[in-house]
């Protein structure tokens, strides 16, 4: 795929302790024209997070030191505080990457705030992954 003009200026943060897979995604998305930040330590991501810098945040669902949902809640709180302090209304999206088989029914019961589209499987081919990310940043 050649870089799409609508990916220019789209900033994505990937937070995942799976260095190999997250590096692969970073490469794929940069080839597609996205601006990427990759952080493999969720604590570093939390400490340095500024919601005004990103259009999409992809978080590893199961990381060894922090659960993806715990990190989501921390980033969401940071976002709310930044919006209050700066009167900003940056609209970014947080979604999850998982290598586990996804049980959407169980996830939607536990976390109704996320639709099925907010779960990205790590097992999909490059073209499917890229298409999914395009839909997340454009929708």
Can you describe what each PLM-predicted range is?
Residues 70, 90, 100-121, 126-131:
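Alpha4 helix (beta4-alpha4-beta5 surface) of REC/receiver domains from two-component response regulators
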Residues 16:
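Conserved acidic carboxylate
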Residues 23-31:
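Charged docking surfaces used in two-component/phosphorelay signaling
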Residues 38-56:
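Acidic, metal-coordinating helix/loop segments flanking the phosphotransfer/catalytic sites
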Residues 22, 64:
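The feature encodes the CheY-like receiver
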Residues 1-11, 86-91, 125-139:
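Non-catalytic signal-transmission and effector/linker regions of two-component phosphorelay proteins
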Residues 40-41, 67-75:
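Acidic catalytic/metal-coordinating carboxylates
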Residues 60:
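Active-site residues of response regulator receiver
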């Amino acid at each position: 795929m050649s870089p799409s003009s609508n990916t220019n200026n789209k900033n994505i943060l990937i937070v995942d302790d799976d260095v190999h897979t997250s590096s692969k995604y970073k490469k794929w998305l940069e080839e597609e024209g996205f601006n990427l930040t990759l952080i493999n330590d969720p604590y570093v991501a939390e400490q340095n997070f500024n919601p005004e810098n990103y259009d999409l945040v992809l978080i590893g669902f199961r990381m060894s030191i922090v659960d993806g949902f715990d990190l989501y809640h921390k980033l969401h709180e940071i976002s709310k505080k930044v919006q209050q302090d700066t009167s900003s209304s940056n609209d970014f999206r947080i979604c999850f990457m998982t290598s586990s088989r996804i049980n959407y029914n169980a996830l939607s019961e536990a976390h109704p705030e996320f639709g099925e589209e907010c779960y990205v499987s790590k097992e999909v081919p490059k073209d499917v992954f890229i298409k999914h990310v395009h839909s997340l940043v454009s929708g």
